[in-house]
Amino acid sequence: MIRSKNADITIEPLKLEEYGRCQNIWNMKTQPLTETWRSEIASGNRLVFIYKINGEFIGEGALVLEADDPDYTIPGRRVYISRMIVKKEYRNRGIGSKMLAFLIEKAKEMGFAEAAIGVDKDNANALHLYRKFGFTEVLFDGADEYGEFYKLLKRI
């Protein structure tokens, strides 16, 4: 957990019983993977961290330990950083940078040597952030049913 000096800003692990509060950050009703992610949290494969201001859910990021895609995870070596999202009205305030730095440090503490992240090609702000943090190696440049995206890698 990280606390700010004035103790109203924290980054904390998500408790499964609070998963529904993520609705404050993203629309859980229209996201088809909402229940899949809930199951991954329950199994311990998806470690979700929440950025809070005065207890309000503002940002979310996750570490996925094992995925079916070796570009994203290699057990014991590579972790997948997933669901980096900040509530729209709080964007461009450095919250994404704080979340990403926290997740990278957490992955390092857990013994991972690499972190992978996926990003839509048209998400210029996220691409800039990820490159600034050293996600410069392109593992995949292509598309799926959701559009064109990159899988990027950083050695940590």
Q: Where is each model-derived feature located?
A:
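Hydrophobic pocket-lining residues that define ligand/cofactor binding sites across diverse proteins
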Residues: 107, 112
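Residue-level detector of beta-propeller blades
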Residues: 57, 137-138
